[in-house]
Amino acid sequence: MQQHALYHPVSIGPLSLKGNVFFAPVAGYSDSAFRSIAIEWEASFTYTEMVSSEAMVRDSLNTKRLIRRASNETHYAIQIFGSNPAVMAETAKLIVDSAQPSCIDINAGCPMPKITKTGAGAALTREPTRLYEVVKAVADAVYAQDARIPVTVKIRAGWEEAHLTWKEAARAAVDAGAQALALHPRTCAQCYAGEANWDIIADLVQCARGWGEVPVFGSGDLHAPEDARAMLEHTACAGVMFARGAMGNPFIFRQTRQLLTEGYYTPVTFEQKLRAAWRELHLLAQDVGESSACKQMRKRFVSYAKGERGKTQWCQRAVHASSFADFAAVIRDACPCIGL
């Protein structure tokens, strides 16, 4: 595949996107603050963290906050999880009415026991029949309200190595009305250990071509722009979804676009990292308040400082920061050229 063709527009049903480098849903990170930063650094498409269908129908205030669109999000997807088709359908209708997202994504890939024990997340990949019922209910509900909003599904390779059900799950999702698929090619048993098997993504791409040219997006072991290029070349997937690789590193989206289109990318300075962290803190505070934002930002600051000399000292202070002033002091000491 020619390098210039690796970065390109993509369509998910009626939804047209200018690029194919996405920010995946990440629990505890994919809030509107970080999504906004990711968009500033050229993420082509962004997803909310997964939203509980049960909490949504209970009218949870926290859940309503999770689905809020960032101010600079032209397009975004809301990811929902659950195992009850009726509840999932009701959740989808509520979301379409209240948030008007560009896409609704169904989580059939989360490996966390607290999710799978309810029959949701990766447990749906293990049970293609149940997945079909969930996707069909959601798709029917969404398309009846607004046919411009595609329903998509993210799956895993399977429950364990001896039971790889990705093909059956993917086909069930498409037959039920899903207009795109995303695949994390690890099993639920692996969680995030070991290597992601990109060969499975390539196999799914081939299968999906026979199901009506359904686009397939890949995730797993994407930690650098070079990883994205390698996945696109190896699998011929329609696009890539950065998850953990984007934590504290929203710059990876622009760098990946540069690598795919120009063959090189511009390194990010420590000052740029700290300025992005400071901006994220303030965006987060607009949503949850200064105190809560500072608590959440502690671990995120550590991610921003990854790979920098002297990070241990700054991070030790950052994990105890409880105010804007505390973070400003840490940032000024780490990079005096930043005038805060």
Swiss-Prot record:
Q: Does the keyword Repeat apply?
A: no
InterPro entries per record: Aldolase_TIM, DUS-like_FMN-bd, DUS_fam, DusB-like, tRNA-dHydroUridine_Synthase_C, tRNA_hU_synthase_CS
The EC class name is: oxidoreductase
Cofactor list: FMN
A GO MF label: tRNA binding
Record EC number: 1.3.1.-
The catalytic activity, as recorded, is:
a 5,6-dihydrouridine in tRNA + NAD(+) = a uridine in tRNA + NADH + H(+); a 5,6-dihydrouridine in tRNA + NADP(+) = a uridine in tRNA + NADPH + H(+)
UniProt entry keywords in alphabetical sequence = Flavoprotein, FMN, NADP, Oxidoreductase, RNA-binding, tRNA processing, tRNA-binding
Name the family.
Belongs to the Dus family.
Function in brief: Catalyzes the synthesis of 5,6-dihydrouridine (D), a modified base found in the D-loop of most tRNAs, via the reduction of the C5-C6 double bond in target uridines.
Question: Can you say what this protein is called?
Answer: Probable tRNA-dihydrouridine synthase
Q: Which organism is it from?
A: Treponema pallidum (strain Nichols)
